[in-house]
């Protein structure tokens, strides 16, 4: 999955992965993390997700990382937020009062940027990677997170052979096999969301499960 793939998607605005509403699992389960209002929350591969607005409304300081510059700029313009822009090593740093976004490669994001986060939220990052790259991303996420930090992970699972990702299918078995070395994992919910996703229906995907997990960095 080359960076050019995602840049092309954003420049052509082929962003079906961008949700127009706040993720229901985020609304339903975020309070389970029991974070203080001022907690710093890391959002990897954040795009221009409205979920970051929800997190900021909970009083959190949001730190996001996004590869594409247009996605970051659209987050601030779509939400009518004034921001400042500076250079932070290999990354462009965009900041407003409660949201701080780093535009660039997550694999070169300095660990000091996330060293004092207390939580993370991954809805569209893990499922963005094909299987041959997913474990590498999961290790980098773990590397960026301090021990004890809590996270809400949202995944999609479906018969991968029925549709070319992204989003890619991530099964409970994959979670168990690849995340347990670095995280304590608690499954929170799983539901079929096929009817809400016309692209999957059109491709005759037989089922599409969205699942939520509570994670704790070991």
Swiss-Prot record:
Keywords: Cytoplasm, Methyltransferase, S-adenosyl-L-methionine, Transferase
Alphabetical list of NCBIfam families matching this protein: PRK13255.1, TMPT_Se_Te
Family: Belongs to the class I-like SAM-binding methyltransferase superfamily. TPMT family.
Organism, scientific name: Shewanella sp. (strain W3-18-1)
Binding residues for S-adenosyl-L-methionine: 10, 45, 66, 123
Enzyme kind, highest EC tier: transferase
InterPro entries linked: SAM-dependent_MTases_sf, Thiopur_S-MeTfrase_Se/Te_detox, Thiopurine_S-MeTrfase, TPMT
Gene Ontology cellular component list: cytoplasm
Record GO biological process: methylation; response to metal ion
Gene Ontology terms for molecular function: thiopurine S-methyltransferase activity
Catalysed conversion reaction: S-adenosyl-L-methionine + a thiopurine = S-adenosyl-L-homocysteine + a thiopurine S-methylether
Localization, UniProt: Cytoplasm
Protein name: Thiopurine S-methyltransferase
Major localization listed first in the record, in broad terms: cytoplasm
Record keyword DNA-binding present: no
Domain of life of the organism encoding this protein: Bacteria
Pfam families in the cross-refs: TPMT
EC number: 2.1.1.67
């Amino acid at each position: 999955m080359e960076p050019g793939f995602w840049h092309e998607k954003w420049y052509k605005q082929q962003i079906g992965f961008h949700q127009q509403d706040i993720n229901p699992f985020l609304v339903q389960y975020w309070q389970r993390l029991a974070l203080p209002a001022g907690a710093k929350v890391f959002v990897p591969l954040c795009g221009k997700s409205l979920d970051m607005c929800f997190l900021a409304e909970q009083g959190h300081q949001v730190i996001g990382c996004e590869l594409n510059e247009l996605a970051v700029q659209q987050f601030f313009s779509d939400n009518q937020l004034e921001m400042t822009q500076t250079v932070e090593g290999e990354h462009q740093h965009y900041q407003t009062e409660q949201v701080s976004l780093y535009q660039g490669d997550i694999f070169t994001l300095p660990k000091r940027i996330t060293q004092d986060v207390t939580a993370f939220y991954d809805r569209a990052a893990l499922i963005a990677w094909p299987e041959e790259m997913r474990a590498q991303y999961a290790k980098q996420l773990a590397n960026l997170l301090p021990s004890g930090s809590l996270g809400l992970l949202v995944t999609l699972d479906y018969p991968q052979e029925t549709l070319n990702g992204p989003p890619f299918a991530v099964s409970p078995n994959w979670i168990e096999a690849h995340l347990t070395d670095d995280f304590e994992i608690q499954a929170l919910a799983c539901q079929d969301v096929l009817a809400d996703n016309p692209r999957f229906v059109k491709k005759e995907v037989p089922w599409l499960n969205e699942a939520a997990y509570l994670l704790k960095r070991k």
